[in-house]
Amino acid sequence: MAQIPPSLQDLVNRFNQAQAQLQSVLLRKQQYEAELKEVEKALAEIEKLPQDAKIYKSVGNFLIPQTKDAALQELKERKELLELHAKTLTRQESMLREQIDKLRDEINKELGKLRGGAQEAAKGGS
């Protein structure tokens, strides 16, 4: 059995690392998107409330009173931040997918060379 050339092993290692990074990015993106949905729901509910409604913000184990305007402002800022993070992760996801595709092509090319060389060796040995 022939050993895997170091160049191919390096490609496989880089491919595996890129896949692990992609999984991490996808997980973080999913978390940001879930939190974004929660923030959007909260915004929609608070906007329905009268201006003088009592709103409380959870801080650790305490509930702190907050004005409707302050709550809306804080949620809108949080929404913007989450959207920015999700957009950044989408770009990272795209770059990683491209990198994975290129590495996959390089690996297949190297495997093709190995198979071709193995077939030539088998023919020469007959």
From Swiss-Prot:
Subcellular location: Cytoplasm
GO biological process assignments: chaperone-mediated protein complex assembly; protein folding
InterPro entries, sorted: PFD_beta-like (IPR002777), PfdB (IPR012713), Prefoldin (IPR009053)
GO molecular function: protein-folding chaperone binding; unfolded protein binding
CDD domains membership: Prefoldin_beta_GimC
Entry keywords, A to Z: Chaperone, Cytoplasm
Disulfide bonds: none
Principal cellular location given in the protein's record: cytoplasm
GO cellular component: cytoplasm; prefoldin complex
Leader sequence segment: none
Cytoplasm recorded as keyword: yes
Family according to the record: Belongs to the prefoldin subunit beta family.
PANTHER family in the cross-refs: PREFOLDIN SUBUNIT 6 (PTHR21431:SF0)
Role played: Molecular chaperone capable of stabilizing a range of proteins. Seems to fulfill an ATP-independent, HSP70-like function in archaeal de novo protein folding.
Assembly and interaction partners: Heterohexamer of two alpha and four beta subunits.
Protein name, UniProt field: Prefoldin subunit beta
Gene name of the encoded protein: pfdB
